[in-house]
Amino acid sequence: MLSSFAQKVKAFIAENQLLQPESTYLLALSGGCDSVALLRIMIELNYHVAAVHCNFQLRNAESKRDEMFCEGLCWSLKVPFHRVYFDTKAYASLHHVSIEMAARELRYDYFEKLRKDISADDILVAHHQDDNIETVLLNLIRGTGIQGLLGMKPKNGHIIRPLLSVSRKEIEQYLSSIHQDYVTDSSNLVADVMRNKIRLEVIPLLKTLNPSVSDN
């Protein structure tokens, strides 16, 4: 019997016609709470996935820890595992972009290349409700207009977001219920970039005014 979390994700996938049972998907696996939950739920729902982990070489021993965790998790679950190393700082300097933008460009370019190499149909990423509200607020602050206020799409080209209907709290509860651990990226806990400031300071304030803000 499927868990209530699995049922909710399954319904969202069906409602938006995101996945097909006969297809193969490339799943972006950082080792964090969200992507680990995505991997476990895709297995629970019997989808065919291969995982890819990006080591951006930005956090020294922590980056290696994350990589080894992902490798071990995929080995235990019998999921094909791919990894890639990036010189993120050099790329950022060469292209005159922020570290965050460099990491984004590097990973999505590589995801598409690997998707073609392994003949995967689409790429799965673990964005959820909380990420979506962060994106809307970030776009509002940047003044991106009406289009930016629409937030993330469940599917955009070859990028699919099966977890957009669930919150970070629901994800944490799901992993706890199946006794699945994960790693924590310490850089996400510091309010030194705009998205982190929104996550750590703005959204908690909004939730004091409306506890269901991420559901809207």
Regions found by a protein language model. Name each.
Residues 1-203:
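Core alpha/beta nucleotide-donor-binding catalytic domains of modification enzymes
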Residues 206-216:
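An accessory alpha-helical subdomain
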